[in-house]
Amino acid sequence: MSETENKTTTETPTTTDSTVTTKEVKVPKATSKGNDDYFFVKNVKNQLSNTRTRATVDRLAPTPPLSQAAKRKLIDTKERKEKKEKKEKEPKEPKEPKEKAKKKAKTEKKKDDGDEEEDEEKEEDEEQKEEQSQEEDSEESEEEQNSDEDKKKKKKQAKKVAKKETEPKKKEAKPKKEAKPKKETTKKEKEATTTSSDSTEKKEKEEKPKKEKKISKKDQAAAEKKKDGDDSTTTTATATTTTDDSTENKEEKKDKKTTKKPAAAEKKKVKKDGDDDETAAAATEEKKDEEKSEEKEKKETKKPAAPKKPAAAEKKKTAANPTDKKDGENKDVTPSDDKPAATTTTTTAAAATTTEEPKEKITKPAADKKKAPANKKAEKDQSSSDESANKETTTATTTTTNKDATAPTTTTNKDATAPTTTTTKDNVDEASVKKTANSAPKKEAAKNKSK
Protein backbone atom coordinates (compact mmCIF):
# COMPACT_ATOMS: atom_id res chain seq x y z
CA MET A 1 0.00 0.00 0.00
CA SER A 2 0.98 3.64 0.07
CA GLU A 3 3.55 4.95 2.51
CA THR A 4 2.78 8.01 4.68
CA GLU A 5 5.19 10.91 5.09
CA ASN A 6 5.13 13.78 7.56
CA LYS A 7 4.95 17.14 5.78
CA THR A 8 4.85 20.54 7.44
CA THR A 9 2.73 23.34 5.97
CA THR A 10 3.01 26.94 7.07
CA GLU A 11 -0.18 28.98 7.64
CA THR A 12 -0.34 32.70 8.43
CA PRO A 13 -2.98 33.52 11.01
CA THR A 14 -5.43 36.42 10.54
CA THR A 15 -4.10 38.14 13.65
CA THR A 16 -1.92 41.26 13.53
CA ASP A 17 1.08 39.35 14.87
CA SER A 18 3.86 38.79 12.37
CA THR A 19 4.68 35.34 13.75
CA VAL A 20 3.95 32.35 11.53
CA THR A 21 2.38 29.25 12.99
CA THR A 22 3.05 25.84 11.56
CA LYS A 23 0.81 22.79 11.40
CA GLU A 24 1.75 19.22 10.78
CA VAL A 25 -0.48 17.51 8.24
CA LYS A 26 -0.07 13.90 7.20
CA VAL A 27 -0.43 13.61 3.41
CA PRO A 28 -0.38 10.15 1.77
CA LYS A 29 1.97 9.66 -1.18
CA ALA A 30 0.17 8.68 -4.38
CA THR A 31 1.86 5.92 -6.33
CA SER A 32 -0.53 5.52 -9.25
CA LYS A 33 -3.46 7.43 -10.66
CA GLY A 34 -5.74 4.45 -10.37
CA ASN A 35 -5.64 4.35 -6.56
CA ASP A 36 -8.06 6.18 -4.31
CA ASP A 37 -5.09 7.68 -2.43
CA TYR A 38 -4.28 9.85 -5.46
CA PHE A 39 -7.59 11.71 -5.28
CA PHE A 40 -7.30 11.99 -1.51
CA VAL A 41 -3.92 13.70 -1.75
CA LYS A 42 -5.24 16.09 -4.40
CA ASN A 43 -8.15 17.17 -2.22
CA VAL A 44 -5.83 17.81 0.75
CA LYS A 45 -3.60 20.07 -1.33
CA ASN A 46 -6.60 22.10 -2.50
CA GLN A 47 -7.74 22.54 1.07
CA LEU A 48 -4.32 23.87 2.12
CA SER A 49 -4.22 26.37 -0.73
CA ASN A 50 -7.68 27.71 0.12
CA THR A 51 -6.80 28.32 3.80
CA ARG A 52 -4.63 31.35 2.97
CA THR A 53 -6.74 34.52 2.98
CA ARG A 54 -6.30 37.77 1.03
CA ALA A 55 -5.14 39.68 4.11
CA THR A 56 -2.21 37.42 4.78
CA VAL A 57 -1.06 37.66 1.19
CA ASP A 58 -1.18 41.50 1.23
CA ARG A 59 0.86 41.67 4.41
CA LEU A 60 3.54 39.38 3.11
CA ALA A 61 3.79 41.17 -0.27
CA PRO A 62 5.95 44.33 -0.47
CA THR A 63 3.97 47.66 -0.71
CA PRO A 64 4.50 49.59 -3.99
CA PRO A 65 5.23 53.38 -3.92
CA LEU A 66 2.08 55.62 -3.87
CA SER A 67 1.17 57.76 -6.88
CA GLN A 68 0.57 61.53 -6.63
CA ALA A 69 -3.20 61.14 -6.95
CA ALA A 70 -3.22 58.65 -4.08
CA LYS A 71 -1.15 61.00 -1.94
CA ARG A 72 -3.58 63.92 -2.60
CA LYS A 73 -6.53 61.78 -1.60
CA LEU A 74 -4.82 60.91 1.66
CA ILE A 75 -4.14 64.59 2.37
CA ASP A 76 -7.76 65.58 1.62
CA THR A 77 -9.14 62.94 3.88
CA LYS A 78 -6.85 64.10 6.70
CA GLU A 79 -7.97 67.74 6.34
CA ARG A 80 -11.65 66.80 6.37
CA LYS A 81 -11.21 64.78 9.51
CA GLU A 82 -9.50 67.72 11.22
CA LYS A 83 -12.33 70.12 10.32
CA LYS A 84 -14.96 67.79 11.67
CA GLU A 85 -13.10 67.43 14.92
CA LYS A 86 -12.86 71.22 15.35
CA LYS A 87 -16.61 71.71 14.80
CA GLU A 88 -17.43 69.05 17.30
CA LYS A 89 -15.19 70.69 19.90
CA GLU A 90 -16.80 74.20 19.52
CA PRO A 91 -19.80 74.94 21.87
CA LYS A 92 -23.21 74.94 20.07
CA GLU A 93 -25.66 77.92 20.45
CA PRO A 94 -29.07 77.06 21.93
CA LYS A 95 -31.82 76.93 19.22
CA GLU A 96 -34.79 79.32 19.55
CA PRO A 97 -38.31 77.88 19.65
CA LYS A 98 -40.24 77.74 16.34
CA GLU A 99 -42.93 80.26 17.33
CA LYS A 100 -40.38 82.97 18.12
CA ALA A 101 -38.61 82.35 14.84
CA LYS A 102 -41.88 82.75 12.91
CA LYS A 103 -42.66 86.07 14.64
CA LYS A 104 -39.25 87.43 13.80
CA ALA A 105 -39.69 86.48 10.14
CA LYS A 106 -43.05 88.28 9.96
CA THR A 107 -41.70 91.49 11.48
CA GLU A 108 -38.79 91.49 9.10
CA LYS A 109 -41.15 91.07 6.13
CA LYS A 110 -43.30 93.99 7.28
CA LYS A 111 -40.29 96.22 7.55
CA ASP A 112 -39.22 95.26 4.07
CA ASP A 113 -42.74 95.91 2.70
CA GLY A 114 -42.89 99.33 4.36
CA ASP A 115 -39.58 100.33 2.90
CA GLU A 116 -40.72 99.23 -0.55
CA GLU A 117 -43.93 101.30 -0.31
CA GLU A 118 -41.98 104.40 0.64
CA ASP A 119 -39.66 103.88 -2.29
CA GLU A 120 -42.61 103.52 -4.68
CA GLU A 121 -44.22 106.76 -3.46
CA LYS A 122 -40.99 108.65 -3.95
CA GLU A 123 -40.66 107.32 -7.49
CA GLU A 124 -44.24 108.35 -8.37
CA ASP A 125 -43.64 111.91 -7.12
CA GLU A 126 -40.54 112.20 -9.21
CA GLU A 127 -42.36 110.96 -12.33
CA GLN A 128 -45.16 113.49 -11.87
CA LYS A 129 -42.67 116.34 -11.55
CA GLU A 130 -40.93 115.26 -14.74
CA GLU A 131 -44.22 115.09 -16.67
CA GLN A 132 -45.20 118.59 -15.56
CA SER A 133 -41.87 120.00 -16.63
CA GLN A 134 -42.18 118.29 -20.04
CA GLU A 135 -45.67 119.71 -20.59
CA GLU A 136 -44.49 123.22 -19.80
CA ASP A 137 -41.62 122.87 -22.25
CA SER A 138 -43.95 121.60 -25.00
CA GLU A 139 -46.36 124.54 -24.54
CA GLU A 140 -43.54 127.04 -24.81
CA SER A 141 -42.23 125.40 -27.97
CA GLU A 142 -45.72 125.43 -29.57
CA GLU A 143 -46.13 129.12 -28.84
CA GLU A 144 -42.81 129.86 -30.46
CA GLN A 145 -43.74 127.84 -33.54
CA ASN A 146 -47.09 129.59 -33.87
CA SER A 147 -45.44 132.98 -33.69
CA ASP A 148 -42.99 132.00 -36.40
CA GLU A 149 -45.81 130.73 -38.66
CA ASP A 150 -47.79 133.94 -38.20
CA LYS A 151 -44.80 135.98 -39.23
CA LYS A 152 -44.31 133.89 -42.38
CA LYS A 153 -48.00 134.17 -43.37
CA LYS A 154 -47.90 137.93 -43.01
CA LYS A 155 -44.85 138.15 -45.24
CA LYS A 156 -46.53 136.03 -47.96
CA GLN A 157 -49.67 138.15 -47.93
CA ALA A 158 -47.63 141.32 -48.28
CA LYS A 159 -45.81 139.88 -51.31
CA LYS A 160 -49.13 138.90 -52.98
CA VAL A 161 -50.54 142.38 -52.55
CA ALA A 162 -47.44 143.94 -54.07
CA LYS A 163 -47.66 141.62 -57.12
CA LYS A 164 -51.32 142.42 -57.75
CA GLU A 165 -50.66 146.11 -57.74
CA THR A 166 -47.66 145.97 -60.06
CA GLU A 167 -48.78 143.35 -62.67
CA PRO A 168 -51.78 144.17 -64.96
CA LYS A 169 -54.59 141.71 -65.43
CA LYS A 170 -53.48 139.43 -68.28
CA LYS A 171 -56.09 136.77 -67.90
CA GLU A 172 -59.12 137.28 -70.10
CA ALA A 173 -62.44 135.64 -69.48
CA LYS A 174 -62.59 132.52 -71.62
CA PRO A 175 -65.93 131.64 -73.30
CA LYS A 176 -67.77 128.92 -71.45
CA LYS A 177 -68.36 125.64 -73.24
CA GLU A 178 -71.86 125.28 -74.58
CA ALA A 179 -73.77 122.32 -73.15
CA LYS A 180 -74.57 119.68 -75.77
CA PRO A 181 -78.30 119.10 -76.34
CA LYS A 182 -79.49 115.79 -74.96
CA LYS A 183 -80.68 113.19 -77.43
CA GLU A 184 -84.41 112.71 -77.34
CA THR A 185 -85.19 109.00 -76.95
CA THR A 186 -88.16 107.77 -78.93
CA LYS A 187 -90.98 105.73 -77.46
CA LYS A 188 -89.84 102.57 -79.27
CA GLU A 189 -86.34 102.81 -77.82
CA LYS A 190 -87.75 103.37 -74.34
CA GLU A 191 -90.04 100.35 -74.70
CA ALA A 192 -87.17 98.20 -75.98
CA THR A 193 -84.97 99.15 -73.07
CA THR A 194 -87.75 98.57 -70.57
CA THR A 195 -88.67 95.19 -72.07
CA SER A 196 -85.04 94.04 -72.10
CA SER A 197 -84.58 95.07 -68.49
CA ASP A 198 -87.85 93.40 -67.52
CA SER A 199 -86.90 90.18 -69.32
CA THR A 200 -83.52 90.04 -67.58
CA GLU A 201 -85.18 90.62 -64.22
CA LYS A 202 -87.74 87.89 -64.93
CA LYS A 203 -85.01 85.45 -65.91
CA GLU A 204 -83.10 86.16 -62.72
CA LYS A 205 -86.27 85.73 -60.67
CA GLU A 206 -87.09 82.46 -62.43
CA GLU A 207 -83.58 81.08 -61.96
CA LYS A 208 -83.49 81.81 -58.25
CA PRO A 209 -86.71 79.96 -57.32
CA LYS A 210 -85.70 77.02 -59.55
CA LYS A 211 -82.57 76.49 -57.49
CA GLU A 212 -84.57 76.85 -54.31
CA LYS A 213 -87.20 74.40 -55.59
CA LYS A 214 -84.59 71.71 -56.21
CA ILE A 215 -83.48 71.95 -52.62
CA SER A 216 -87.02 72.27 -51.31
CA LYS A 217 -88.18 69.13 -53.16
CA LYS A 218 -85.51 67.04 -51.49
CA ASP A 219 -86.33 68.56 -48.14
CA GLN A 220 -90.04 67.90 -48.68
CA ALA A 221 -89.41 64.29 -49.66
CA ALA A 222 -87.29 63.77 -46.56
CA ALA A 223 -89.97 65.38 -44.39
CA GLU A 224 -92.69 63.19 -45.89
CA LYS A 225 -90.63 60.07 -45.27
CA LYS A 226 -90.16 61.06 -41.66
CA LYS A 227 -93.87 61.76 -41.20
CA ASP A 228 -95.25 58.67 -42.88
CA GLY A 229 -92.45 56.29 -41.97
CA ASP A 230 -93.06 54.38 -45.24
CA ASP A 231 -92.61 55.09 -48.94
CA SER A 232 -96.13 53.78 -49.70
CA THR A 233 -97.56 57.26 -50.34
CA THR A 234 -95.09 58.05 -53.11
CA THR A 235 -95.54 54.72 -54.87
CA THR A 236 -99.36 54.94 -54.87
CA ALA A 237 -99.22 58.31 -56.59
CA THR A 238 -97.22 56.89 -59.50
CA ALA A 239 -99.48 53.86 -59.74
CA THR A 240 -102.62 56.02 -60.01
CA THR A 241 -101.13 58.07 -62.84
CA THR A 242 -100.37 54.96 -64.90
CA THR A 243 -103.87 53.56 -64.39
CA ASP A 244 -105.42 56.86 -65.47
CA ASP A 245 -103.42 56.76 -68.71
CA SER A 246 -104.53 53.20 -69.44
CA THR A 247 -108.21 54.03 -68.82
CA GLU A 248 -108.00 57.02 -71.17
CA ASN A 249 -106.59 54.83 -73.95
CA LYS A 250 -109.39 52.29 -73.44
CA GLU A 251 -112.07 54.99 -73.57
CA GLU A 252 -110.66 56.34 -76.83
CA LYS A 253 -110.82 52.86 -78.39
CA LYS A 254 -114.42 52.41 -77.21
CA ASP A 255 -115.42 55.74 -78.77
CA LYS A 256 -113.96 54.63 -82.10
CA LYS A 257 -115.90 51.35 -82.00
CA THR A 258 -119.22 52.96 -81.05
CA THR A 259 -119.12 55.38 -84.00
CA LYS A 260 -120.54 52.69 -86.29
CA LYS A 261 -124.31 52.46 -86.55
CA PRO A 262 -126.39 49.84 -88.41
CA ALA A 263 -127.89 50.79 -91.75
CA ALA A 264 -131.42 49.71 -90.72
CA ALA A 265 -131.49 52.18 -87.87
CA GLU A 266 -130.38 54.94 -90.22
CA LYS A 267 -133.19 54.08 -92.65
CA LYS A 268 -135.76 54.35 -89.88
CA LYS A 269 -134.44 57.75 -88.85
CA VAL A 270 -134.62 59.03 -92.41
CA LYS A 271 -138.22 57.83 -92.79
CA LYS A 272 -139.20 59.47 -89.51
CA ASP A 273 -137.97 62.81 -90.77
CA GLY A 274 -140.56 62.61 -93.57
CA ASP A 275 -138.21 62.67 -96.54
CA ASP A 276 -138.87 60.80 -99.77
CA ASP A 277 -137.84 57.18 -100.38
CA GLU A 278 -135.22 58.29 -102.89
CA THR A 279 -133.46 60.58 -100.49
CA ALA A 280 -133.51 57.84 -97.83
CA ALA A 281 -131.94 55.31 -100.19
CA ALA A 282 -129.24 57.79 -101.22
CA ALA A 283 -128.42 58.52 -97.59
CA THR A 284 -128.13 54.83 -96.71
CA GLU A 285 -125.86 54.17 -99.68
CA GLU A 286 -123.57 57.01 -98.68
CA LYS A 287 -123.33 55.69 -95.13
CA LYS A 288 -122.59 52.19 -96.39
CA ASP A 289 -119.74 53.57 -98.49
CA GLU A 290 -118.38 55.40 -95.46
CA GLU A 291 -118.53 52.25 -93.32
CA LYS A 292 -116.73 50.25 -96.00
CA SER A 293 -113.97 52.83 -96.22
CA GLU A 294 -113.58 52.78 -92.43
CA GLU A 295 -113.36 48.98 -92.41
CA LYS A 296 -110.68 49.08 -95.11
CA GLU A 297 -108.63 51.55 -93.09
CA LYS A 298 -108.87 49.33 -90.00
CA LYS A 299 -107.82 46.27 -91.97
CA GLU A 300 -104.81 48.15 -93.30
CA THR A 301 -103.81 49.21 -89.80
CA LYS A 302 -104.03 45.63 -88.50
CA LYS A 303 -101.10 43.30 -89.16
CA PRO A 304 -101.71 40.83 -92.02
CA ALA A 305 -102.51 37.27 -90.94
CA ALA A 306 -100.07 34.47 -91.69
CA PRO A 307 -100.61 32.89 -95.15
CA LYS A 308 -102.09 29.42 -95.01
CA LYS A 309 -100.02 26.51 -96.20
CA PRO A 310 -101.54 24.22 -98.82
CA ALA A 311 -102.72 20.76 -97.79
CA ALA A 312 -100.18 19.08 -100.07
CA ALA A 313 -97.25 20.56 -98.14
CA GLU A 314 -98.78 19.35 -94.89
CA LYS A 315 -99.20 15.84 -96.33
CA LYS A 316 -95.50 15.73 -97.24
CA LYS A 317 -94.65 16.89 -93.75
CA THR A 318 -96.71 14.17 -92.06
CA ALA A 319 -95.42 11.47 -94.40
CA ALA A 320 -91.82 12.42 -93.67
CA ASN A 321 -92.42 12.59 -89.92
CA PRO A 322 -94.99 9.92 -88.96
CA THR A 323 -93.57 9.94 -85.43
CA ASP A 324 -94.63 13.57 -84.66
CA LYS A 325 -96.87 13.37 -81.62
CA LYS A 326 -98.68 15.65 -79.26
CA ASP A 327 -97.85 16.17 -75.60
CA GLY A 328 -100.26 13.46 -74.35
CA GLU A 329 -98.80 10.58 -76.43
CA ASN A 330 -95.98 8.24 -75.52
CA LYS A 331 -92.79 9.25 -77.32
CA ASP A 332 -90.45 6.46 -76.19
CA VAL A 333 -91.45 3.40 -78.29
CA THR A 334 -88.79 0.85 -79.13
CA PRO A 335 -89.15 -1.03 -82.42
CA SER A 336 -88.58 -4.78 -82.45
CA ASP A 337 -86.84 -6.48 -85.38
CA ASP A 338 -87.36 -10.06 -84.08
CA LYS A 339 -90.67 -10.83 -85.91
CA PRO A 340 -91.53 -10.15 -89.56
CA ALA A 341 -93.20 -6.85 -90.47
CA ALA A 342 -96.38 -8.55 -91.74
CA THR A 343 -97.76 -8.88 -88.22
CA THR A 344 -97.21 -5.17 -87.26
CA THR A 345 -100.12 -2.72 -87.28
CA THR A 346 -100.23 0.91 -86.11
CA THR A 347 -103.20 2.89 -84.88
CA THR A 348 -102.95 6.59 -84.11
CA ALA A 349 -105.46 7.52 -81.46
CA ALA A 350 -105.69 11.08 -82.66
CA ALA A 351 -106.67 10.12 -86.21
CA ALA A 352 -109.20 7.48 -85.11
CA THR A 353 -111.00 9.61 -82.60
CA THR A 354 -111.25 12.75 -84.69
CA THR A 355 -113.42 10.97 -87.31
CA GLU A 356 -116.10 10.17 -84.74
CA GLU A 357 -116.52 13.66 -83.30
CA PRO A 358 -117.50 16.78 -85.25
CA LYS A 359 -115.03 19.55 -85.95
CA GLU A 360 -114.76 22.32 -83.41
CA LYS A 361 -114.05 25.75 -84.81
CA ILE A 362 -111.75 27.57 -82.44
CA THR A 363 -111.93 31.31 -82.80
CA LYS A 364 -108.53 32.81 -82.07
CA PRO A 365 -108.24 36.36 -80.74
CA ALA A 366 -106.27 39.09 -82.47
CA ALA A 367 -103.29 38.52 -80.18
CA ASP A 368 -102.88 34.93 -81.51
CA LYS A 369 -103.00 36.18 -85.09
CA LYS A 370 -100.13 38.52 -84.36
CA LYS A 371 -98.10 35.67 -82.89
CA ALA A 372 -98.75 33.48 -85.97
CA PRO A 373 -95.67 34.50 -87.99
CA ALA A 374 -93.38 33.90 -85.03
CA ASN A 375 -94.93 30.46 -84.46
CA LYS A 376 -94.57 29.69 -88.16
CA LYS A 377 -90.82 30.18 -88.04
CA ALA A 378 -90.56 27.93 -85.00
CA GLU A 379 -92.60 25.23 -86.77
CA LYS A 380 -90.37 25.41 -89.84
CA ASP A 381 -87.26 24.99 -87.71
CA GLN A 382 -88.84 22.06 -85.87
CA SER A 383 -89.94 20.37 -89.12
CA SER A 384 -86.45 20.65 -90.61
CA SER A 385 -84.88 19.18 -87.47
CA ASP A 386 -87.49 16.39 -87.36
CA GLU A 387 -86.86 15.49 -91.01
CA SER A 388 -83.15 15.16 -90.40
CA ALA A 389 -83.79 12.99 -87.36
CA ASN A 390 -86.14 10.74 -89.35
CA LYS A 391 -83.53 10.29 -92.10
CA GLU A 392 -81.03 9.03 -89.56
CA THR A 393 -83.47 6.76 -87.64
CA THR A 394 -85.95 5.29 -90.11
CA THR A 395 -87.04 2.41 -87.84
CA ALA A 396 -88.23 4.65 -84.95
CA THR A 397 -92.02 4.50 -85.56
CA THR A 398 -95.07 3.95 -83.37
CA THR A 399 -95.29 0.20 -84.13
CA THR A 400 -95.53 -2.77 -81.78
CA THR A 401 -94.99 -6.44 -82.77
CA ASN A 402 -97.14 -9.30 -81.52
CA LYS A 403 -95.08 -12.39 -80.71
CA ASP A 404 -97.97 -14.93 -81.18
CA ALA A 405 -99.29 -13.18 -84.33
CA THR A 406 -102.85 -14.02 -83.24
CA ALA A 407 -103.73 -10.49 -82.00
CA PRO A 408 -102.42 -8.21 -84.75
CA THR A 409 -103.91 -4.90 -83.48
CA THR A 410 -102.07 -3.07 -80.68
CA THR A 411 -102.43 0.52 -79.45
CA THR A 412 -99.44 2.63 -78.59
CA ASN A 413 -101.29 5.54 -76.91
CA LYS A 414 -102.14 5.04 -73.23
CA ASP A 415 -105.03 7.50 -73.35
CA ALA A 416 -106.58 6.12 -76.56
CA THR A 417 -110.00 5.66 -74.89
CA ALA A 418 -110.31 9.36 -74.14
CA PRO A 419 -111.63 11.33 -77.14
CA THR A 420 -108.96 13.76 -78.34
CA THR A 421 -109.58 16.63 -80.72
CA THR A 422 -106.77 17.82 -82.95
CA THR A 423 -106.69 21.53 -83.83
CA THR A 424 -104.03 22.23 -86.44
CA LYS A 425 -102.79 25.82 -86.68
CA ASP A 426 -102.70 25.80 -90.48
CA ASN A 427 -106.20 24.22 -90.87
CA VAL A 428 -105.07 20.92 -92.44
CA ASP A 429 -107.79 18.41 -93.40
CA GLU A 430 -108.21 15.43 -91.11
CA ALA A 431 -108.52 13.08 -94.06
CA SER A 432 -104.90 13.82 -95.05
CA VAL A 433 -103.79 12.99 -91.50
CA LYS A 434 -105.58 9.63 -91.72
CA LYS A 435 -103.99 8.78 -95.05
CA THR A 436 -100.50 9.55 -93.84
CA ALA A 437 -101.04 7.51 -90.66
CA ASN A 438 -102.21 4.49 -92.67
CA SER A 439 -99.50 4.85 -95.31
CA ALA A 440 -96.62 4.94 -92.81
CA PRO A 441 -96.77 1.27 -91.70
CA LYS A 442 -97.08 0.08 -95.30
CA LYS A 443 -93.88 1.87 -96.27
CA GLU A 444 -92.05 0.42 -93.30
CA ALA A 445 -93.23 -3.09 -94.14
CA ALA A 446 -91.86 -2.68 -97.67
CA LYS A 447 -88.51 -1.50 -96.28
CA ASN A 448 -88.27 -4.45 -93.91
CA LYS A 449 -88.99 -6.90 -96.75
CA SER A 450 -86.26 -5.37 -98.90
CA LYS A 451 -83.81 -5.77 -96.03
Swiss-Prot record:
Species this chain originates from: Dictyostelium discoideum (Social amoeba)
**Coiled-coil region(s) at which residues?**
none
Q: Taxonomic lineage of this organism?
A: Eukaryota, Amoebozoa, Evosea, Eumycetozoa, Dictyostelia
Q: From what superkingdom does this record's organism come? A: Eukaryota
Q: Where is this chain compositionally biased, Basic and acidic residues type?
A: 73-99, 163-192, 199-210, 217-230, 284-303, 311-340, 356-383, 441-451
Which residue stretches does the UniProt record annotate as biased composition, category Basic residues?
152-162
Q: Where is the composition biased (Polar residues)?
A: 44-54
Q: Where is the composition biased (Low complexity)?
A: 9-22, 232-244, 341-355, 393-425
Region annotated Disordered sits at 1-451
Q: Locations of Acidic residues compositional bias?
A: 114-147
Q: What is this protein called?
A: Uncharacterized protein DDB_G0286299
